[in-house]
Amino acid sequence: SLTSRNLVATVGADHWHTVVVDECHRLAADRFDTFAKAVRPSVLLGLTATPERSDGQPIAQYFDARPDGSPAVELRLWHALDLQLLAPFEYYACDDATDFSEVPWDRPGEREAVDNLVTGNDVRARLVINEWRRLASDARQSRAIVFCVSVAHAEFMTDWLNRAGLPAACVVGTTASEERRRAPQRLLSGELCALVTVDLYNEGIDLPMVDTLLLLRPTQSPVLF
């Protein structure tokens, strides 16, 4: 990597005329922050579709802005959808009556509190499956990714889907690499109709066969939404 090879120290901070940083919302992470503050190109161009970071750290500090503080060029996802630059989608919100009012949002214990409400919740799991079947012409023919709260929740939902006749595989960080590699192909072939996961397939992945997303974790993040 740029950091491990000490390229800035080796060739000089002003060696590059132009530096392009893709996925520049990652700049606020420690190792990228060090590089961004060390390099001195004539042009530093950052590209991202999700400028908001979940930890709230700003990325504007790394770049020059217009007098009003806005980016040099900005086209948000919702505007790109309006301009038909991205594939359109239909979004359905289904009320499962789960009471999340006591969840400590954006504070320690948030994920654990949500996990306790949804993992093992048979009523909610049954409703999810019924709503999927109601909204899809044929849920078995879907190619879905199911985003869950935790590994335990993913395993719970995988069991429910399989028992309902909707073949699914749980694919999480601890899943064997060969199984993870084969999972998208199994989805494409129709052997599976769902991959159930937690923090995989969030970004930097191209799965054109996917036609359905089930977001089974509540979120206040505009990035995830």
Language model features by range: what are they?
Residues 18, 25-91:
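Post-DEXD/H (motif II) to motif III coupling segment of the RecA-like Helicase ATP-binding lobe
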Residues 145, 154-162, 166-202:
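Conserved helicase ATPase core of P-loop NTP-dependent helicases/translocases
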